[in-house]
Amino acid sequence: MPATLYDLIPRDEKPGNDVLLGRFLDYVAGRRLQLYPAQESAILELFEEKNVILNTPTGSGKSLVATALHFQAIAQGRRSIYTCPIKALVNEKFMALCREFGPDNVGLSTGDASVNREAPLLCCTAEILANIALREGAQANVQEVVMDEFHYYADRERGVAWQVPLLTLPQARFLLMSATLGDTTFFEGELTRLNGRPTVAVSSTARPVPLEHAYSELPLAKTLESLAAEGKAPVYVVHFTQLEAAQSAQDFTSINVCTREEKAALAGALEGFKFSSPYGPDIKKWLRHGIGLHHAGLLPKYRVLIEQLAQKGLLKIICGTDTLGVGINVPIRTVLFTRLCKYDGQKTGILSARDFHQIAGRAGRKGFDDRGWVVAQAPEYVIENLKLAEKSARDGKKTVKRQPPEKNFVNWDKSTFTRLIAAPPERLASRFQVTHGMLLNVLSRKGDGCRAMQQLIARCHETPRQKQTHIKRAWQLFCSLLDRKIVEFIEPRRSRREEVHSEMQSAECEARNESEIVVRLHPDPLPQEREQQGVAAGLPEASELASARKQILPLPGGEGRGEGERKLRVNIELQEDFSMDQALSLYLLDTIPLVDPQQPDYALILLTLVESILEDPDIILRKQLDQVKDRKMAEMKMEGLDYDQRMEELEKLEYPKPNQEFIYSTFNAFADRHPWVGQENIRPKSIAREMFESFRSFSDYIRDYELQRAEGVLLRHLNRVYKVLAQNVPDAAKNDQIREMELYLGSMIRQVDSSLLDEWEKMRNPNFQRAETKEVRPPGAEEAALDITRDTKAFTATIRNRIFVFLRGLVIADYEAALGSLSEGRVPRAPETDSVTQSQGLAELVPPKDADGQPWTADRLRATMEAYELKHERICLDPNARNARHTYVTPSDDQKSWRVQQMLVDPEEDNDWLAEFEVDLVQSRALGEPFLRLRRIGSLV
């Protein structure tokens, strides 16, 4: 049997569909698989060159149908795209398809990573495909599209990405897949209208593994014990908040669900994996008990690990949110709903039938189970009242019944559960919306971008009234982009004949008193007054956007665009990777020039502007506010304020919002000029800035704010800040400190969680084997640490940050903290089996010593600072002091270490003291972080 599907492709000729179908069916038979009727029907229709909508339950083999389409496409020289909503699933599919078609033929693009992007088979998120479709349309090199989890079409925030390809890729054939599509009649008609191909819906409600349902009125722990005892584990316990999931994981450690042999197998599977973040020890402890945690707040590497352990059957319980209900291929025998109501971002209500079936469908997987179980817990107050009633009957005493929660709760009972089981998924609703990113992508096309934008709105799956709203918003966004020169007109050279022709047309137009505006070849920008008048008064039959288009189109009667015609272009002077993905990116571009680059805190203000256009990571801001309140409460108690006064003052407090007056005033002015911004709001905050100003590492920040359960939230925020700095801030606005911020953030993000690219490089080895014989380990397992010293600039930025952590300890007279920032002075945690510090090799470190071998102690540092302060007021830590010109790096002759001298900047600007460090490069590579030794602090002379 050939090793991969790629080996089955005929090399001597372009094969026909019959030949390819036969070879694919041979492949299926060779793997001892038997196609379900729906699978067989869908594959046959695909080989008849039809669009297919595959609406079958979870576990019914939709992935194999998609693989058949990829096989057909690659064999016949057509490019196929696989999309889905979850980056982790895109990564998983990428790895699986690399095994079947070879890594040279498969690419990846998720926004976080891009590998072999021009490959004949591309795995990407739906947003990536939508951007390709918007930018290139019918010219895009896309012939086959697989859209997995297509029910995301109805997602409020992201649904437009699933709709755009259906509007703009007439050259492509589509395979739409989901377990919860509902009525597909509309999409059948739209696909055929788009590409002229017949569209077939293949639907089935028959599950390969049947489900049994039960409603439980036992306490949650007892329900789990019962399920485990009955052999119904692994159990996926569904929560709708990350906090509840984490609390349950901790609570369930009191339940013994694993045998000694199973725990030993878990310990072996975890060997070599680096639980190096602050939350790592907790996750490792739960995993040793056979309990996994899965939600979006975790670092990606932990989610991948938990998924792989579950695939091996090593986990008995997974406490998660509904994220596991979307596409991740994890074998679960039982799904247990802790509640049947959910907050959907606007209100709390009973689960939709689609959400219920999507999550419940994870129960029971072919090849693992002969049936699956779906269990719903009664509300907690109902279970408590049943226990009280039993106690009352037993004791003969009356009890006070518990009442349902007043907030974030909608009551449910067994009949609710029964109704959800029987209910079909709701019809998918359009979520089309016009954004800056959409407009820029469409206007970037080689052809007539304005006409393409008109057609996009005209073809979208909205009502006529909604389309008019989209037209107005597109017009407003277009004027904003033009005003800010993000898009601009190119004025061509004109002959005298063309000028006369233009003037005559204008005169004729005015004489007829036409409302439409014909093209003018002399400069005719769109002023602010025209924008306001056009929107306020409304234009006749030709919409506002159509009127804008008429200013850009060539002269009537011309074919294409000639030399004398006015053109529109996206400003090519912006850096190549400039991005407008953030809704308020235009505000950022508008405001950066208002900040004086000569200000000492210019870089910090710019960083705050960047953070202000990003969504609020609420859990981090709440933790910040808690600390602000704690400090204020302590101050007020010292001042003797009474309780009511203290409470009144606490209500006035906010989390840190640096430069908020400047940000709010500039944003209000911006909003006055751009009506569309009313849908958005500015959100000043200080997270990345606080980390940079206080020289904190990722782990420092997590511990300081007790954010262990939200490490993934912090990582995502930092990643977004990094991307905006890199892609949205013009290069001309970046000084050395801003570039160092980029290096600092990029280096931190890579150290915390990385390595998809490393996995791909491993697979490029000609000797790589398929997953059945050699497993691809999760990131962080059985891998040498990344060479942190390879990128010299990023490594230097990380060293400088560590040095300023040390200096900050000196400035605030926290000499123990200063010593702790040195690699030799790192204080290990109390000994424990799962110690992260032991796994990093830091448990047996000796006290730090200077160049002469004398130990550094808190008393010695105190004496050194007293000597310094006899000559200088203090050590400065302001932006000037952090300038890279005050840091001197000298590599050793043997290339095993660096000598780093940091000038101690003082208010008097004498700058006659320095701190000298040795950076051990060998140790740094081993640990994945700079290994610093303090050699001396003292005068230059």
Predicted features along the sequence, with ranges:
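Helicase-associated low-complexity/disordered flanking segments
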Residues: 1-44, 48-52, 260-288
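Conserved two-lobed SF2 helicase motor
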Residues: 118-133, 289-300, 310-329
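Non-catalytic terminal extensions of ATP-dependent helicases
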Residues: 292, 312, 404-518, 528, ...
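Conserved segment of the helicase C-terminal RecA-like domain
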Residues: 341, 352-390
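Conserved C-terminal RecA-like helicase domain
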Residues: 81-83, 91, 98-107, 242-317, ...
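A short beta-strand element within the Helicase C-terminal
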Residues: 317, 324-341, 372-375
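Conserved P-loop/Walker A NTP-binding site and adjacent catalytic elements of P-loop NTPases
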Residues: 25, 33-208, 216, 234-239, ...
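Conserved interdomain hinge at the start of the Helicase C-terminal
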Residues: 216-240, 247, 304-312
